[in-house]
C-alpha cells in the first residue's frame, strides 16, 4: 500500500466516532506488552472480577432456532435477529472460524444507533455457538452419535442461504429486504462466495469483508497449528476464559469480550480435568481439512462478484497482488484500522458500524435520483415548443404524421 493510501486511510479514521471507554480495572495492565504470547498468559484472580459475562440483552430483539433436515442430519440453526423496519436494510453477518454470532453484538447495537430502521441477522455457523448438528436415526429421532464435521465452503454457503430464506418465512416477510452481507475472516470467504454465485439476486446491495485476504490467509495457515497448540485448551471458569481473550489481546475490547466469549465455551458435564471444566465449543484443529478450501480464489471472487465491495483490514500491508491492482482501479472501497486486532468488529464496534452504514448508504438504490432519459427530455421540449406556438396537435391529411394544415 502506498504512503498516500495510508495517509488517506488515517485521515478517514480520524473523522469516525470514538470508541466508548473500556471497563475500568482496579489493577493496571502492567504486563500488557507480553500479551502477544498466548502461551504465557494466565488469568489472575483479581482481574476475574472484571471479566464477568455481559449477557446478550440489548443487542438483538430475538433469537430464532431454525430446524432443517439434510440427508441424515438434523440441524438447528441458531440466529440472533433484529428485524428491519420502514423498508430498512438487513445486515447479514457471518462470523469467523471458532467464533459465534455474538461476535457482531456490539457492532449491531452501534449500527442501530446510527440507522434505527436497519435489521441485523447474525447466525451461529454449524458446529459453532448454539447451532447443533446431530445424526438422525431411522425412527427420526436424533442420534447421540456425533455427526461428521462438514465446514466446507459450499456447505457454509448453503447454510447461510437457508438461514436467510427461512428467517424470511418465519418472520412472514413478503419479500426479502435489501441485504448487505458482512463477513469476518472465514465469514468473509462465505459471504463472498454467496455474492459471487448470485443466489440472492437483486436483493444483494453490497458485501463487506473484514480482515481476510487470500494471500495473507494462505500464509497464516502455515502457522495455524502452532498457534492452536499454544492457546489454552480449557479454563477453570468462564471469567478466566474471557480474561484470556483480553490479556492475550485476541479481543482488545473488554466490553465485547464479555458478550461474545461465553458463547465460545461450554461446561463439560463430566470434566476430564475437574479443575478446568470449561472447554471450546469448536475444535479448530479438527477443521484443518477445510482451511485451504475456504480461501483459495477469494480475491478473484471478491473483485468479480456483483454489488458494492468493501474491505476492512486491521493492518496496512495485507493486500495481495490482485487486490492491490483492484484498489488502484477503484473496484472496491478500502478502510484500514491500524489500532485494531483481527477482530475488528469487536475491538472497534462503533467505527466499524459507522463505516458499514456509510457503505450501505452509498449503495442504497432507493436513494438514487436518476437523471431523465434523453428521449424523455426531447419529448418534453417538443411539447413545450408546440404549446408555445399555439398550434393544435393532429395529423396531416392522408392520415400520416406530417405538417399541420390550418383551416
Curated annotation (Swiss-Prot):
**Entry-linked InterPro entries:** AB_hydrolase_1, AB_hydrolase_fold, PPase_methylesterase_euk
What are the Gly residues biased-composition ranges?
388-401
Q: What is its EC number?
A: 3.1.1.89
Keyword Aminoacyl-tRNA synthetase among record annotations: no
Entries under Gene3D superfamilies matching the protein: alpha/beta hydrolase (3.40.50.1820)
Keywords attached to this entry? Hydrolase, Serine esterase
List the catalytic activities from the record: [phosphatase 2A protein]-C-terminal L-leucine methyl ester + H2O = [phosphatase 2A protein]-C-terminal L-leucine + methanol + H(+)
Q: Which residues form a coiled coil?
A: none
Enzyme class name: hydrolase
- Where's the active site on this chain? 185, 211, 342
Pfam families (alphabetical): Abhydrolase_6 (PF12697)
Q: Which GO terms describe its molecular function?
A: protein C-terminal methylesterase activity
Stretches for region Disordered? 1-53, 388-407
The record's comment on protein family reads: Belongs to the AB hydrolase superfamily.
- Record PANTHER family: PROTEIN PHOSPHATASE METHYLESTERASE 1, PROTEIN PHOSPHATASE METHYLESTERASE-1 RELATED
Function noted in UniProt:
Demethylates proteins that have been reversibly carboxymethylated. Demethylates the phosphatase PP2A catalytic subunit.
Task: Spell out the protein name for this chain.
Answer: Protein phosphatase methylesterase 1
Source organism of this protein record = Emericella nidulans (strain FGSC A4 / ATCC 38163 / CBS 112.46 / NRRL 194 / M139) (Aspergillus nidulans)
Amino acid at each position: 500500500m502506498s504512503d498516500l493510501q495510508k495517509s488517506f486511510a488515517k485521515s478517514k479514521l480520524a473523522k469516525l466516532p470514538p470508541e466508548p471507554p473500556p471497563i475500568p480495572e482496579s489493577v493496571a495492565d502492567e504486563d500488557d506488552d507480553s500479551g502477544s504470547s498466548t502461551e504465557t498468559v494466565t488469568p489472575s484472580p483479581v482481574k476475574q472480577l472484571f471479566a464477568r459475562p455481559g449477557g446478550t440483552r440489548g443487542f438483538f430483539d430475538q433469537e430464532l432456532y431454525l430446524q432443517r433436515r439434510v440427508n441424515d442430519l438434523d440441524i438447528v440453526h441458531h440466529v440472533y435477529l433484529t428485524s428491519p423496519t420502514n423498508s430498512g436494510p438487513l445486515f447479514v453477518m457471518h462470523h469467523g472460524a471458532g467464533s459465534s454470532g455474538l461476535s457482531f453484538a456490539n457492532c449491531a447495537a452501534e449500527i442501530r444507533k446510527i440507522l434505527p430502521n436497519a435489521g441485523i441477522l447474525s447466525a451461529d455457523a454449524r458446529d459453532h455457538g448454539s447451532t447443533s448438528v446431530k445424526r438422525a436415526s431411522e425412527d427420526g429421532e436424533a442420534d447421540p452419535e456425533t455427526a461428521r464435521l462438514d465446514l466446507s465452503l459450499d456447505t457454509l454457503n448453503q447454510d447461510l442461504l437457508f438461514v436467510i430464506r427461512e428467517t424470511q418465512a418465519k418472520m412472514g416477510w413478503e419479500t426479502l429486504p435489501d441485504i448487505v452481507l458482512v463477513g469476518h475472516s472465514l465469514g468473509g470467504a462465505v459471504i463472498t462466495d454467496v455474492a459471487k454465485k448470485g443466489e440472492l439476486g437483486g436483493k444483494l446491495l453490497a458485501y463487506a469483508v473484514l480482515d481476510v485476504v487470500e494471500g495473507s490467509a494462505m500464509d497464516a495457515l502455515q502457522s495455524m497449528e502452532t498457534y492452536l497448540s499454544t492457546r489454552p485448551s480449557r479454563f477453570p471458569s468462564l471469567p478466566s476464559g474471557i480474561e484470556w481473550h483480553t490479556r492475550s489481546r485476541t479481543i482488545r475490547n473488554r466490553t465485547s469480550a464479555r458478550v461474545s466469549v461465553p458463547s465460545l465455551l461450554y461446561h463439560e458435564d463430566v470434566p476430564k480435568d475437574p479443575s478446568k471444566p470449561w472447554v471450546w465449543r469448536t475444535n479448530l484443529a479438527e477443521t484443518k481439512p477445510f482451511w485451504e478450501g475456504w480461501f483459495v480464489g477469494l480475491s478473484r471472487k471478491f473483485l468479480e462478484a456483483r454489488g458494492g465491495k468493501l474491505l476492512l483490514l486491521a493492518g496496512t500491508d495485507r493486500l495481495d497482488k490482485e487486490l492491490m491492482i483492484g484498489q488502484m482501479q477503484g473496484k472496491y472501497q478500502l478502510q484500514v484500522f491500524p489500532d485494531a486486532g483481527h477482530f475488528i468488529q469487536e475491538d472497534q464496534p462503533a467505527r466499524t458500524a459507522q463505516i458499514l452504514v456509510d457503505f450501505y448508504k452509498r449503495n442504497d438504490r432507493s436513494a438514487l435520483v436518476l437523471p431523465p432519459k434523453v428521449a424523455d427530455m426531447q419529448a418534453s421540449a417538443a411539447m413545450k415548443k408546440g404549446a408555445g406556438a399555439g398550434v393544435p396537435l393532429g395529423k396531416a391529411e392522408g392520415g400520416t404524421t406530417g405538417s399541420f394544415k390550418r383551416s
